[in-house]
Amino acid sequence: MMAGMKIQLVCMLLLAFSSWSLCSDSEEEMKALEADFLTNMHTSKISKAHVPSWKMTLLNVCSLVNNLNSPAEETGEVHEEELVARRKLPTALDGFSLEAMLTIYQLHKICHSRAFQHWELIQEDILDTGNDKNGKEEVIKRKIPYILKRQLYENKPRRPYILKRDSYYY
């Protein structure tokens, strides 16, 4: 009887370790997929004039995922009819709702990852440079003639400032 309990205990331990390893593999796989997705998105060349539509769509999807909890729900101003309709939906679409919830959770994790937030800031900077471009060009236009003038007209050797000015320096 003792041997039977030891065998059952060993089987339970093997089952537990295998399930833990499967969970860690799936988490590592998710992290790898997220990293690949974000590096491909970040390393692709970004045009300053035109932002690719899929990147803007991803930004829109992230804003939609972030706005799932509307302000009306947070303050408690939701009508009872809407709550009843929402309660009936998961029971009718059981398998689909679980898959949709998992997809929304994965999108939520991707949208809140640090790499994506960094890419989003870069994207906003690129979109804002179109507005600030005129101001930067004015600054450059003021500096360029001075630099060109200094480079073009410095053909003669510089006069040492320590020595006295005499006629032979002119």
Swiss-Prot record:
One of its GO terms (cellular component) is transport vesicle. The keyword Signal applies. Keywords: Cleavage on pair of basic residues, Cytoplasmic vesicle, Pyrrolidone carboxylic acid, Secreted, Signal, Vasoactive. One of its GO terms (biological process) is positive regulation of phosphatidylinositol 3-kinase/protein kinase B signal transduction. Its main location: secreted. It is found in: Secreted; Cytoplasmic vesicle, Secretory vesicle. The modification Pyrrolidone carboxylic acid is found at Q151. One of its GO terms (molecular function) is neuropeptide receptor binding. The record marks P160, Y161, I162 as: Cleavage. Residues 1-23 form the signal peptide. InterPro entries: NeurotensiN. Belongs to the neurotensin family. Neurotensin may play an endocrine or paracrine role in the regulation of fat metabolism. It causes contraction of smooth muscle. Interacts with NTSR1. Interacts with SORT1. Interacts with SORL1. This is Neurotensin/neuromedin N.
